[in-house]
Amino acid sequence: MIFYTDGSCLANGSINAKGGYGVVGVDDEEKVQFVRARSETGTTNNRQELKAILYVMLNFGVKCDDWGQPPIVYSDSAYCVNTFNEWMFNWARKGWIKSDKKIPENLDLIQAYYDWYKEGYRIDLRKIKGHAGDQWNELADQLATGYISEEEAYATYG
């Protein structure tokens, strides 16, 4: 299964912020097999993007010694792809401090992902261009923004 993730936030970073994330899992026949949408207040778009990817890692990540390939996960967030594919390893080595001597934002989510990574779990996280017409990325965006519900996504694309 291939996953597409997205996060969204209105009034990003403010006390009145309302955000959400969407996850879409598509099988080899281009049928939606899994959707997830969650929302919360007092958040940021980056936090929601990270949560979507973390959800896939925790629920569908493949342990290195298991049979099979890790699931491919597409995100349109360069921040998230770079965080989980590169930056977190340097931050962990330096005691979770960035080069500017600051603690990374969303450290709780990054450390949760890193802990699973250290246990041998993997996903194949890749960057996709956002809002470029990919129907599954667009569906993840619609779930994240609340434009479409999980039930509507299954009924339309399942």
Enumerate the language-model features and the residues they cover.
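RNase H-like nuclease fold core
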Residues: 1-47, 58-62, 141, 145-152, ...
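RNase H catalytic domain
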Residues: 8-14, 55-139
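Short, conserved alpha-helix that lines the donor NDP-sugar binding/gating region
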Residues: 49, 53
